[in-house]
Amino acid sequence: MEVATDQPRWMTHHAVLNGQHPESHHPGLAHNYMEPAQLLPPDEVDVFFNHLDSQGNPYYANSAHARARVSYSQAHARLTGSQMCRPHLIHSPGIPWLDSSKAALSAHHHNPWTVNPFTKTPLHPSAAGAPGAISVYPGSSTSSTASVSSLTPASHSGSHLFGFPPTPPKEVSPDPNSTSAASPSSSAGARQEDKDSIKYQVSLSEGMKMESASPLRSSLTSMGAQPSTHHPIPTYPSYVPAAHDYSSSLFHPGSFLGGPASSFTPKPRSKARSCSEGRECVNCGATATPLWRRDGTGHYLCNACGLYHKMNGQNRPLIKPKRRLSAARRAGTCCANCQTTTTTLWRRNANGDPVCNACGLYYKLHNVNRPLTMKKEGIQTRNRKMSNKSKKSKKGSECFEELSKCMQEKSSPFSAAALASHMAPMGHLPPFSHSGHILPTPTPIHPSSSISFGHPHPSSMVTAMG
């Protein structure tokens, strides 16, 4: 036996349990199906479908489902590999709607992974109008997507098949009351709802790409241009880290100006101070020094002892040497030429004898001893003129002192009080919510974890999440 070229070999026509010919359900698709050799008895229906479930072979009613399943299987195999989850509905003879319905499982057996959660279940109008048609999602309407079959298979699989892994629906018992026949009046509304679901899915995938960036970057970009407020399906983890990673004051309105310090405020670095506590110079016993050094054995030295040891190669003496008397008041010293005992600077002549500053300079310049007739009782000093650099530095210091006095006397416009008064009108900044998405809102909202959807979801999406 041969199967149609547009379907895999494992996808064959199911056993019609209600005694009707397949062409009565699908008049235009009779050539795509194989006529079964014989019909299965009603009591072997469960065994037949359990056998299909055990082999993992999905079963479809029309070619639209088959093409969507093949294209989705190829795309999903590249994404998930061997970790693909294949949940299925458990069928048992004890379920009343299986026993009472002559059509058993309608025209086909649904696999939740082949059905788009953003659309309704049957895609073919005849399948939707079958008397035994059963919806996987109880809250969905089978007639809402009756006109989707007008789409081409390529465009349908490209727009509806998932841009992200789907959420497997819960195992629910279909509601027989939810089935209804497709009517021309409802087809227009179904087409509009399906278009809305397509737009919602595309914008949702784009929003998830934007959310993959860092939280701070996404928050800054959302301040400039408000993106759509789509949220990921609640079964997946949030894309924003936990609240403890960032302080709540960062997104608090009062933290921008004059409010409590945010989590990014640099903390005072007291590590160096805490590490230096308890150190003591092994030479002089000092505990405070601008720079700690080490000797050859690794012991700590203060800056003074370390420099002395580095320059002289020996330890710095603990007792400071006495300061020598000034050259002018050196006891027992007199000039060998003029016999004076007071001078600003003691010098030595060629013989090594001490001479006063005047006699030493005179001998240095004229190579003769200074005559005694030039000796004076007082020491003549020169009135040196101040250089330009010293004048500028002095003027700068005086101007700084005057400016500081003026700042203390009068309230400057740069004072803290004036700055606070200027900051007060800035309180109209829009508050920010501390939820998963950071969006500027005109009115404050409570920082709760509840998800508010900006666009109405299809009923199947809401039912799957519920």
From Swiss-Prot:
Subcellular location per the Swiss-Prot or TrEMBL entry: Nucleus
Zinc finger (GATA-type): 281-305, 335-359
Biased composition (Low complexity): 139-155, 174-188
Function: Transcriptional activator which probably serves as a general switch factor for cell-specific development. It binds to DNA sites with the consensus sequence 5'-[AT]GATA[AG]-3' within regulatory regions of genes.
Single GO BP term: positive regulation of transcription by RNA polymerase II
PANTHER family in the cross-refs: ENDOTHELIAL TRANSCRIPTION FACTOR GATA-2, TRANSCRIPTION FACTOR GATA FAMILY MEMBER
Tissue and organ distribution: Expressed in all developmental stages of erythroid cells but is additionally found in a limited subset of other tissues.
Subcellular location, principal: nucleus
Gene3D superfamilies: Erythroid Transcription Factor GATA-1, subunit A
InterPro entries, per database record: TF_GATA-2/3, Transcription_factor_GATA, Znf_GATA, Znf_NHR/GATA
UniProt name for this protein: GATA-binding factor 2
Origin species: Gallus gallus (Chicken)
One matching Pfam family: GATA
Stretches the record annotates as Disordered: 139-196, 436-466
A molecular function (GO) term: DNA-binding transcription factor activity, RNA polymerase II-specific
GO CC annotations, alphabetized: nucleus
Keyword tags: Activator, DNA-binding, Metal-binding, Nucleus, Repeat, Transcription, Transcription regulation, Zinc, Zinc-finger
Organism placement in taxonomy: Eukaryota, Metazoa, Chordata, Craniata, Vertebrata
Tree of life domain: Eukaryota
Membrane-spanning parts: none
Coiled coil segments of this chain: none
